[in-house]
């Protein structure tokens, strides 16, 4: 049946040949459907007499007979059901039962439920039908005619305005390493808001929290942490949080990094004879600055910035003096979209999109088939695990000094890096992913503890000049991965200069030259993969967290940081397969701010003084005195600071055992906390004095051991 539009009428014609052909022509697309004659059990060269008689009788009659039905303008405006009834009545007396079944099949295929199926199979059906018709039928099949669909248009987005919802709605995020993200339904409403609407939204959520208590909060978070470990079979018995021996302070390692900020190399300096040289007395002034103690009255902007649908919360507080609900200013950096996976926009980054498709092919993707009856699969040290093989391949080629052990990317072992060289471009690992048979619940996944959301973190603002920062409310051992830095993966050539303050460089042409040489050597027999790696090596990519990112975007700068970034791959070796995680360089005590070193150019970039206020601060009042110390004395400074935090932590634990060990703890964090009484505060001062006297002997013994 053919439909053509001429003037104000529509004409339908139905061919009455033995091979009925039904054609639908429209302005947008054209679809041809045909029915092949059924094959006879006899070969195609010897049809039965009945078949030959049928063919001859058909040929004697007019094979190309057609029934023409003309429908007026009024009838063409009728409903589709009425038009079909008109056609069926007209051809019912002229078609055989076989042709009627063909018409009925046309109506079924023309329904909305089958449209997509027809379009997806038309190509394969055309080729198979043409081959079958040429071998077993005297009537050749007619080719299917289709028009190409119009190119899909995407919205134009700005890097300075919220666009996370647009990218997700248009299915533009092609990050291959994304994992399931369970959010509260309100996240969709929030993502569609403008900046001003988000600011008003948080203003309505603000509350004044009175009688806040950091000691009680520390106890509750510790109880919730232990419950998570106990109830999770993949953690219970596999992961243990502990305060290690004295080497856990990482004093010497921290001294090497501190000297690097002074522009000095620890390994190239000659040994000094200290004689009577001692640690400067000014170091004692920095003890109180190690731990941030929140005030009793706080303004809570929100109890959960990332609108999670589980028990994990990331609250936001402002503790600036003199602020009220009416005077609180919510800056634009707080109006971001919280994400737990990097974003790759296939429209803006066509090179990355092409690399993702090549790396994700069945022959190039790296994922293991390891499985076990135990909750945690032992992929690490498994020579048959392709993910561990890739991890071992990268570890064996990481740059480090011969005297230090190479960093291991084990799930439950600390990421202890003893080399004084920068870790970022010299060390990279490989981890199992949720697409593996082990689902990432194995010993070869350094991001597993981050995905479990073990360690509680809060966002706070104590000084408007510094802005918002993050602090831990739990004790975190050295070498623990705690945060993944997420953002939108952007080519450095397109990154606006004003966005550099909220971006972190993921790859570098010069810094990753050694890495790309290794990967090209590995895939030299795979020309397609080799070419895309060669092209990627000419670009440097950034993680832009201006409008979408994770809680890691709030980590402030410090000249003596307690965290450092580290990179690892999943599934493949493109920048889109790379993840950036922050791990602790030293033991983190409850209340301690989590910081990074932004680099030597940070002060020049910001055009202002550094406000980290550490003893090694480049803008600090005692910078000259501490910068002239040698590495061993600086290491002793870090030991003293660690012991000061350790004494305070021990006192707090005894307070918790005395006053808070009995009582119900909520599953999620709830404000306000119960405050201390005057008696409790007096007892704490007495306990602190006694504990300090008792622990000073331990400190002197440990210091003497280190000097020896």
UniProtKB/Swiss-Prot annotation:
Listed under subunit, the entry gives:
Interacts with baz-2.
Q: Where does the record place the SET domain?
A: 455-599
PROSITE patterns annotated for this entry?
SET
What does the record say about tissue specificity?
Broadly expressed in the nervous system, including head, body and tail neurons.
Example of a GO cellular component annotation carried by this entry? chromatin
Q: What happens when the gene is disrupted?
A: RNAi-mediated knockdown prevents age-related decline in the expression of bas-1, a serotonin (5-HT) and dopamine synthesizing enzyme (DOPA decarboxylase). RNAi-mediated knockdown improves behavioral performance in pharyngeal pumping in aged worms.
Q: What does the UniProt keyword field contain?
A: Chromosome, Methyltransferase, Nucleus, S-adenosyl-L-methionine, Transferase
Q: Which stretches does the entry tag as region Disordered?
A: 36-63, 101-152
Q: What is this protein called?
A: Histone-lysine N-methyltransferase set-6
């Amino acid at each position: 049946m053919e439909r053509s539009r001429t003037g104000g009428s529509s004409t339908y014609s139905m061919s009455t040949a033995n091979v009925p052909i039904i054609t639908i022509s429209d302005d947008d697309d054209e679809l041809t459907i045909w029915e092949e004659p059924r094959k006879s059990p006899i070969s195609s060269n010897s049809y039965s007499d009945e078949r030959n008689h049928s063919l001859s009788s058909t040929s004697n009659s007019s094979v190309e007979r057609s029934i023409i039905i003309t429908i007026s303008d009024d009838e063409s405006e009728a409903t589709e059901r009425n038009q079909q009834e008109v056609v069926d009545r007209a051809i019912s007396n002229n078609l055989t039962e076989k042709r009627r079944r063909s018409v009925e099949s046309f109506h079924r295929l023309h329904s909305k439920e089958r449209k997509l199926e027809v379009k997806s199979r038309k190509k394969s059906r055309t080729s198979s039908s043409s081959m079958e018709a040429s071998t077993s039928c005297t009537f050749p099949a007619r080719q299917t005619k289709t028009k190409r669909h119009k190119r899909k248009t995407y919205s134009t987005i700005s890097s300075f305005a919220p666009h996370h919802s647009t990218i997700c709605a248009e299915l533009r995020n092609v990050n291959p390493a994304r994992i399931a993200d369970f959010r509260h339904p309100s996240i969709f409403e929030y993502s569609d808001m403008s900046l001003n609407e988000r600011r008003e939204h948080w203003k309505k959520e603000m509350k004044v929290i009175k009688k806040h208590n950091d000691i009680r909060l520390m106890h509750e978070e510790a109880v919730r942490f232990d419950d998570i470990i106990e109830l999770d079979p993949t953690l219970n018995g596999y992961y243990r949080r502990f305060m290690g021996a004295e080497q856990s302070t990482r004093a010497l390692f921290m001294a090497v990094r501190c000297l690097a900020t002074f522009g000095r190399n620890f390994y190239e300096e000659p040994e000094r004879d200290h004689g009577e040289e001692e640690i400067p007395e000014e170091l004692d002034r920095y003890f109180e600055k190690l731990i941030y103690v929140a005030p009793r009255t706080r303004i809570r902007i929100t109890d959960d910035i990332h609108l999670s649908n589980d028990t994990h919360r990331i609250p936001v507080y402002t503790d600036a003096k003199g602020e009220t609900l009416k005077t609180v200013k919510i800056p634009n950096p707080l109006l971001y979209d919280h994400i737990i996976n990097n974003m790759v926009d296939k429209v803006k980054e066509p090179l990355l999109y092409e690399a993702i498709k090549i790396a994700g092919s069945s022959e190039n993707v790296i994922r293991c088939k390891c499985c076990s009856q135990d909750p945690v699969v032992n992929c690490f040290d498994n020579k048959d695990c392709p993910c561990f093989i890739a991890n071992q391949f990268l570890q064996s080629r990481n740059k480090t000094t011969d005297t230090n052990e190479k960093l291991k990317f084990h799930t439950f072992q600390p990421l202890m890096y003893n080399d004084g060289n920068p870790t970022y471009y010299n060390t990279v690992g490989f981890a199992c992913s949720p697409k593996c048979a082990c689902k990432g619940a194995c010993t070869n996944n350094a991001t597993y503890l981050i995905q479990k959301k073990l360690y509680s973190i809060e966002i706070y603002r104590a000084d408007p000049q510094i802005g918002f920062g993050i602090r831990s409310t739990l004790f975190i051992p050295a070498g623990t991965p705690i945060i993944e830095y997420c953002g939108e993966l952007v080519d450095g050539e397109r990154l606006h200069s004003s966005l550099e303050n909220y971006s972190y460089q993921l790859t570098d042409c010069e810094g990753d030259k050694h890495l790309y040489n290794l990967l090209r050597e590995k895939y030299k027999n795979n020309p397609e993969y080799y070419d895309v790696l060669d092209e990627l090596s000419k670009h440097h990519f950034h993680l832009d967290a201006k409008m979408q990112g994770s809680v890691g975007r709030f980590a402030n700068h410090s000249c003596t940081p307690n965290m450092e970034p580290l990179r690892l791959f999943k599934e493949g070796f493109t920048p889109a397969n790379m993840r950036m995680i922050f791990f602790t360089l030293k033991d983190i005590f409850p209340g301690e701010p989590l910081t990074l070193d932004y680099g030597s150019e940070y002060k020049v970039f910001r055009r202002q003084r550094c406000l980290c206020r550490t003893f090694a601060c480049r803008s600090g009042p005692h910078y000259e005195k501490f910068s002239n110390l040698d590495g061993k004395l600086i290491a002793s400074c870090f030991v003293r600071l660690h012991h000061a935090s350790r004494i305070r932590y021990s006192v707090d634990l005894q307070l918790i055992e005395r006053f808070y060990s009995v009582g119900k703890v909520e599953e999620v964090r709830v404000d306000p906390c119960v405050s201390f009484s005057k008696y409790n505060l007096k007892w704490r001062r007495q306990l602190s004095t006694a504990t300090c006297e008792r622990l000073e002997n331990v400190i002197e013994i440990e210091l003497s051991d280190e000097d020896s």
